[in-house]
């Protein structure tokens, strides 16, 4: 196996594909594979099942989200806007 101190999770690609592509893949995959917080039980046990399908290993909740993160930046923005509208009323 190749050394992966600098390249991390993308060490499996070896000398192929170039630095820029591997850097973006590394950023996406590290963010995808970390533990995310469950919206139901608020514990960091959410793992990706498939593209856009996420499951909490603690409470068993299955929900949809982004392909690489359970809550996309647009979803966060929409939730914030809804909260602001409800506060104003």
Swiss-Prot record:
Superkingdom, natural source: Archaea
One record GO biological process: translation
Gene Ontology molecular function, alphabetical: large ribosomal subunit rRNA binding; structural constituent of ribosome; zinc ion binding
GO cellular-component term (any): ribonucleoprotein complex
Metal-binding among keywords: yes
Coiled coil segments of this chain: none
Zinc finger (C4-type): 38-59
Record keyword Cell wall biogenesis/degradation present: no
Alphabetized InterPro entries for the sequence: Ribosomal_eL37/eL43, Ribosomal_eL43, Ribosomal_protein_eL43, Ribosomal_zn-bd
Required co-factors: Zn(2+)
Pfam families from the UniProt entry: Ribosomal_L37ae
Family (UniProt): Belongs to the eukaryotic ribosomal protein eL43 family.
Record protein name field: Large ribosomal subunit protein eL43
Species annotation: Methanobrevibacter smithii (strain ATCC 35061 / DSM 861 / OCM 144 / PS)
Higher taxonomy: Archaea, Methanobacteriati, Methanobacteriota, Methanomada group, Methanobacteria
Encoding gene (name): rpl37ae
């Amino acid at each position: 196996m190749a050394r992966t101190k600098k390249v991390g999770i993308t060490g499996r690609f070896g000398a192929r594909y170039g630095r820029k592509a591997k850097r973006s893949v590394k950023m996406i995959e590290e963010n995808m594979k970390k533990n995310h917080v469950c919206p139901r039980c608020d514990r960091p046990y959410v793992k990706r099942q498939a593209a856009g399908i996420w499951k909490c290993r603690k409470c068993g909740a299955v929900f949809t989200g982004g392909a690489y993160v359970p809550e996309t930046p647009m979803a966060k923005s929409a939730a914030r806007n809804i909260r602001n509208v409800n506060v104003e009323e």
